């Protein structure tokens, strides 16, 4: 009651100041300063409340990240809860027990057993086992955001948007929490353009619920202010920071992530796209290329050292630079021959992505193209032998759910 009384007192003070300001504002111009003086305290009290709420949100473990359970689990939970309730209080239980029929052990009717039952049911609802390898190409508008997950690791590769400046709060945070993610083992930054990083910056600055263990940046960008900023933010969160180049690998238990680009010792280019990190990700027979925003010249450099891989087809390609005409060259596509390609871009973007010429080159390879602007987030699942791919917008939900054998 004391807390309520305190709240009522503050509300009364705010009302008094507001009423005074309203009355004074009806008086001629010279009294407007007095009205401002009356509204000022209320404004600052609200600011104090907002600041206190923000500080509480930054306290570690102030909330539990449980994830979003599947619909069938929610259904089972409520059915079990209903049966347990009816059995606890209903006449049906008494009639059956007289006949020696027990739906639940007798001990379950002891005081406190309902709490145990509910606790077990909640654990069933919250625990979300991960099977195989899943990739999500997030619907971030004009930008990139890829999330990789196995039973052993959670990895974010880029997250940014030039169409939504609050992509971290609006898309990244809700998505990660819906998956029950409390720790990101790696954040991979292909390059430091805002349409690949502003969501990551927000996460490192504002999101205290999600721990970040490691941050990978392109070696060719070391020393540039944009990368220094990301490095500083990550280290403040207790993360290790690595600058990677071709030939290095990302430590992961279930996945193999090999860096194909940039070259070691490459001079930082003013155009960040050309030193994007490129990763070859493999899980069993499934193989995926994450290409950042590399251009045709960068693709040629990769091809020059990937001759031995030409016979190994790529299952899925994240098309470079949102489908720009300056990427996805004919030689590159012919070399890796992807079965599926994801184009990440925003509808109506000012860059004209994807370029019709790039789309035509992709279509000529026979690849199946998925577009985040059309399908929303694109989800790919594989057990290393089979896979499926689906979109999350209404017209695509459930499409391509049939598992296909992976061919190399």
Regions found by a protein language model. Give the residues of each.
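Non-globular, low-confidence helical/coil segments that flank catalytic cores
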Residues: 3-408
């Amino acid at each position: 009651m004391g807390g309520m009384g305190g709240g009522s007192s503050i509300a009364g003070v705010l009302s008094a100041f507001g009423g005074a300001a309203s009355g004074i504002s009806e008086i001629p111009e010279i009294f407007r300063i007095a009205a401002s003086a009356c509204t000022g305290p209320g404004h600052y009290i609200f600011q104090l409340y907002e600041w206190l709420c923000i500080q509480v949100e930054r306290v570690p473990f102030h909330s539990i990240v449980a994830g979003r359970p599947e619909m069938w689990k929610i259904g089972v939970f409520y059915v079990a809860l209903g049966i347990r309730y009816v059995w606890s209080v209903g006449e049906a239980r008494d009639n059956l027990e007289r006949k020696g029929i027990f739906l639940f052990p007798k001990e379950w009717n002891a005081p406190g057993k309902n709490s145990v039952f509910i606790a077990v049911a909640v654990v069933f609802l919250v625990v979300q086992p991960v099977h195989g390898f899943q990739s999500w190409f997030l619907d971030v508008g004009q930008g990139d955001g890829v999330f990789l997950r196995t039973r052993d690791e959670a990895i974010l590769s880029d997250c940014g948007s030039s169409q939504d400046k609050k992509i971290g709060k609006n898309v990244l945070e809700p998505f990660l929490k819906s998956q029950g993610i409390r720790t990101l083992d790696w954040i991979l930054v292909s390059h430091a353009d805002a349409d690949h990083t502003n969501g990551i910056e927000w996460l490192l600055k504002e999101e205290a619920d999600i721990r970040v263990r490691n941050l990978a940046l392109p070696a060719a960008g070391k020393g540039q202010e944009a990368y220094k900023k990301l490095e500083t933010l990550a280290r403040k969160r207790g993360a290790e920071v690595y600058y990677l180049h071709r030939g290095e690998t990302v430590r992961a238990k279930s996945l193999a992530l090999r860096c194909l680009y940039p070259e070691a010792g490459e001079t930082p280019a003013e155009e960040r796209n050309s030193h994007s990190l490129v990763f070859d990700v493999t899980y069993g027979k499934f193989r995926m290329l994450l290409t950042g925003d590399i251009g045709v010249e960068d693709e040629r450099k990769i091809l020059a050292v990937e001759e031995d891989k030409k016979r190994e087809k790529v299952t899925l390609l994240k098309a470079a630079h949102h489908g720009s005409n300056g990427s996805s060259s004919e030689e590159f596509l012919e070399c890796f021959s992807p079965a599926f390609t994801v184009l990440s871009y925003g509808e109506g973007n000012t860059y004209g992505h994807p370029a019709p010429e790039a789309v035509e080159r992709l279509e000529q390879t026979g690849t199946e193209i998925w577009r985040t602007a059309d399908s929303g987030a694109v989800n790919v699942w594989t057990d290393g032998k089979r896979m499926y791919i689906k979109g999350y917008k209404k017209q695509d939900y459930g499409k391509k759910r049939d598992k296909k054998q992976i061919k190399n």
